[in-house]
Each structure stands twice: as structure tokens, then as C-alpha cells.
Amino acid sequence: MIIDTHIHLDDSRYNDDIDEVLNRAREGGVKRFIIPGAHPDTLERALEIVEANSDVYFAVGIHPYDMDGFDTLDFDMYVKHKKCVAIGECGLDYYRLEGTDEEKEAEKLRQKEVFIAQIELAKKHNKPLIVHIRDASRDSKKVILDNNAGEVGGVLHCYNADEELLSLANENFYFGIGGVLTFKNAKKLVNVLPKIPQDKLLIETDGPYLTPMP
């Protein structure tokens, strides 16, 4: 069975042609779709989509770029929905840190706090995690291990080819692979891929982002 484990169907760019997008994917053999959570503002749209399509599911979470919504989001209400299958996407992203060194460290600390809170939520509700990692492999791995995230496991969304993360396969984590694999600068990922157990690989598009190169 082909499952697109990460597609942002709640993105406004799909508003006008979502039925066409889903039908093309179905015709291509995709049987299930998972909408990751990223920001509270898109959750209601995600609910509309999953309730209208029996083969679409969703996750609830706060992306590290959208932490302002963390304190106001009623996680429990969404997690209890029958089609909520995961927590995330959540994690650490240091790629766009700005400001002084002190401000950057404060931002890292806040990201860790929000990530840990979502790990605890996942354990509370026995849901797997959708983990976002960018330029933060070492800290992300430490947070995952220190907080026993392997109890619920999950997927490392858009796996970044960092070999430091490979051992998380032993902690109940899978590796999400998508369009990045076709990019000209993906040689490292191509070389690392054979080191991942085949039963730990998941397919994702991350649509409408990361379109494969022709």
C-alpha cells in the first residue's frame, strides 16, 4: 500500500484543485494521505478535508517556526478526533535563527521546550511523532533520547542525510524520503539511503513543497 505520509493538503495553494490533486494521486496508486499539523490556523481546514475524504488523515502539532500558536492550541480536542493519527510536525529548526547570540540561544531553548511538550503529548495519547529537523540534528537526537520519545516512535520528516540520526532506527523511528532525493545536491542522501533498513523507510511528498526534479 502506498501512503503519502506528509502532504499539506490544508495549504491554501490546494484550495481550488484539492479534489483533482487527490484523484490524480489515487489514480497513481496512493491509498492514504496524512496531513501534518504545523499551525493552529490550518487545523480547521484539515478537519474539513479529512471529514470529506475517507482516505485522508491528519496530525496535530506546532512547527518550530510557528510556536506562537502553542499556548493557545487545544491539543486534546484535536488529538481525540478519530482521524488524528500522529503528533507533529514538531521538532527543532535552527536554519533561520536571527538576532544576537543570546537571542538565538533563547530561541533554541524555546524550540526545545515546545518540542518536549509535544513529545509528552504524544506519549500521553500513544500517538507517533512527525519530527521536523533542520540544522539541529545533535540537539534533536538528544531531546528524543532524553525524553524517551522512542516509546511512541514516529518519522523523521524529510530526513536530512545526517548519519548521526541513523541510530534512531533502533528507537522506533522511521525516515521520511521525498522529492529531495531527486535534487542535484542530494548526493549525500543517495549515499546514506542504503544504510537505512528498508522497513524503516517511508514515502512522503511534502506537497506543495519540495517538488521532485524531472
Region spans (language model):
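Mid-domain alpha/beta scaffold segments of enzyme catalytic cores
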Residues: 1-214
